[in-house]
Amino acid sequence: PWKFILLNNKKIKEKIRPYAWGAEKALDGASHFVLILARSNQDMRYDSDYLQYIMKEVQKFPDEMIEQRREKFRNFQENDFKLFESERALLDWTCKQTYIPLANMLTAAAILGVDSTSIEGFNKEKVEEILISEGVYDPEHFRLSCMIAFGYTNRDHRPKTRRKLEEVWQLVD
């Protein structure tokens, strides 16, 4: 339920800068600046044309399996996670799904010795307005979830701090 856009366009970067306070340094210094988009509510409903396309054309499921999966997904969306209780709930869930590849991208970058940072520090409404007006994506099918910057930072910056393992980890036997 995601799409990734490598944003190289300097004009667009300058337009979003005033509204992307968490990306100020990254917009200048990062060698790669990626927008992570989440699929829209209309595409992520259990009965959407998009999910039908994924199951039929991409996953090549037979029709009877598609119907079974659609019903399981309906139950998940309606009952398990109650994603239809508000307009925002389904989009929030879809945006959470984008954090799975985001985490993998951050980890892969670290393994390769590339610095990276995830970015949520931006005015979503204003940044989306700019990206949509510039034709970066179609708001009928996508919404901006977060951003990520890749590159090499100045090594003289303050080191990261972390809480003790015992404060964040619990074992239940």
Regions found by a protein language model. Give the residues of each.
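Acidic, surface-exposed loops and disordered segments
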Residues: 1-173
